[in-house]
UniProtKB/Swiss-Prot annotation:
Belongs to the transcriptional regulatory Fis family. Residues 74-93 bind DNA. Homodimer. Keywords: Activator, DNA-binding, Transcription, Transcription regulation. GO terms for molecular function: DNA-binding transcription factor activity; sequence-specific DNA binding. Activates ribosomal RNA transcription. Plays a direct role in upstream activation of rRNA promoters. Pfam families: HTH_8. It comes from Buchnera aphidicola subsp. Acyrthosiphon pisum (strain APS). This is DNA-binding protein Fis. It comes from the Bacteria.
Length: 98
């Protein structure tokens, strides 16, 4: 679950560990862990699209959740995201979410 932590500028993700304890971590830390895991498992393979890969892993679920939250209202979603409505439409099309 994502939430905005009080008096901070980062998003927090609640996760559950093996002892069923709810752990809250900044989203940026989870991204770092995921990237570290990904990079450690490359086994010498070359990667040339990591930025696009990482961005799409965040952008697609973000757009999906915001569109659900706004019940498909693109104007409201664009305002929430701080982007132009035409940019939002372009991104929705990119992920076949239109």
């Amino acid at each position: 679950m994502l939430e905005k932590k009080t008096n901070t500028e980062f998003l927090v993700l609640s996760t559950t560990n093996t002892q069923d304890k709810n752990i809250k971590q900044p989203l940026c830390e989870l991204v770092k862990k995921s990237l570290k895991y990904y990079l450690s498992n490359l086994n010498g393979k070359d990667v040339n699209n990591l930025y696009e890969l990482a961005l799409s892993e965040l952008e697609q679920p973000l757009l999906d959740m915001i569109m659900q939250y706004t019940r498909g209202n693109q104007t409201r979603a664009a305002l929430m995201l701080g982007i132009n409505r035409s940019t939002l439409r372009k991104k929705l099309k990119k992920y076949s979410m239109n």
